[in-house]
Regions:
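Amphipathic alpha-helical "stalk" segments
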Residues: 1-132
Length: 132
């Protein structure tokens, strides 16, 4: 029983191409060319560590009451981060949020993304803005 590493490598490459074409189709279905260009001009790698931390912290708070002080403070931090990513294009941020709430995100596109986390954060953010 030898492992055919070449076959595995070929399978992984096919999977990557399939995933890339799925992401491309999803992008074309949901965004205008200008919006795709907005994303293309962003350095998402730079914010990857921050995003990983945000998703991890959000997940760790899901057993808390969304109106608790700890979750509300985090909701403000989450919004500060989100707003900084969509400077000059807040409507695109809202569109992306709606896609995340609906679960219409290709698997692996946003590391750490889980629809349940987004729905929890949506409750917390709703409470945050109802107090302002």
């Amino acid at each position: 029983n030898t492992i055919d590493w070449q076959a595995i490598a070929t399978l992984l490459e096919v999977f990557k191409m399939t995933h890339d074409s799925m992401v491309k189709e999803w992008s074309e279905r949901n965004f205008t060319e200008a919006e795709v260009n907005f994303f293309a001009n962003k350095d998402f790698q730079q914010s990857k560590v921050e995003n990983d931390e945000l998703w991890g912290e959000a997940k760790s708070l899901m057993d808390k009451d969304p109106s608790s002080l700890k979750v509300q403070n985090f909701a403000q931090k989450w919004m500060n981060s989100a707003n900084s990513k969509y400077i000059g294009n807040p409507e695109l941020g809202k569109k992306m949020w709606e896609l995340m709430k609906s679960g219409d995100i290709p698997e692996g596109l946003i590391p750490g993304y889980e629809q349940e986390i987004v729905l929890f954060m949506n409750k917390a953010i709703g409470i945050l803005y109802s107090k302002k």
